[in-house]
Amino acid sequence: MLKDALRDYLDLYTECWEKEFGDPPMVDAEITEEPSICFVGEADDEGYIQWKYVEQPHPIDFGVIEDKYQIHVCEDVKQLYNSYLFLELQGFLDGQRVHFDPVTDETKDLFFPSDDAPPIDQYPHLVIIGLYGPMDVSLCVDIVTGKVYSWDLDPDTYEYEYEGRYKDPELIADSLTDLLTRLTPMKQ
C-alpha cells in the first residue's frame, strides 16, 4: 500500500536529515503562498523553515479528473496526493536523483503535459510529479496504470534533431510503491 511506503520513506528521509544536519528538514518558507500546516516554528535569517509531514486534511476529489478524462485513477496515485502533505521528498534510485513535487495545502490539481503540448498527446495519462536524474527530466506517473517514467520534455533538447519531437518516456518503476520502497535518502 502506497500510504505505508510513503510514510516509511518520509520517516527515513527525516531521520537521515536529522542525523546529517542535527535538525528536522528545512525548506524555503516561500515554498507555499500561505503558511503551511507543515511548518514547524519560525523561518531562520535565511528564510528557511523546518517542516514535518502531516495527514492530508483535504483530499483531492479524483472524481472530477476521472469524469473529465473518462478514466479510473489508480489507487497509488490517489494515495500519493491524499495521504500526507509534504514540502520536500527526494532520494536516489539506482544512483539517479529523484525529487517529488511537494504535496501542500495548495495542491488542487495535476499537471498533464498532453494538455499543453500536442506532440505528446499519445501519452494522455502521464502527469508530472517531480524531477529525475542529473538533467532534471520530468518524473511522471501514468495515472491509470501507476507506472513511473522519466521523460525529457525540454524542447531545447530536441529542437534541431527532432524538430520538437520528444523521446518516449522511459520506465523506471512499475508503481509508485515500487519506487518509494527502492528509494534511498543518500546516494549509494
Regions found by a protein language model. Name each.
Residues 122-124, 140-148:
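Short, solvent-exposed coil/turn segments at beta-strand boundaries
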Residues 87-91, 95, 145-147, 157-159, ...:
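Generic alpha-helical propensity signal that fires on short helical segments
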Residues 139, 150-187:
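A recognition module on extended beta-rich or small alphabeta surfaces enriched in W/G with H and D/E
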Residues 130-135, 142-145, 153-156:
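Short, flexible beta-strand-to-coil junctions
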Residues 1-137, 187:
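A surface-exposed partner-binding patch
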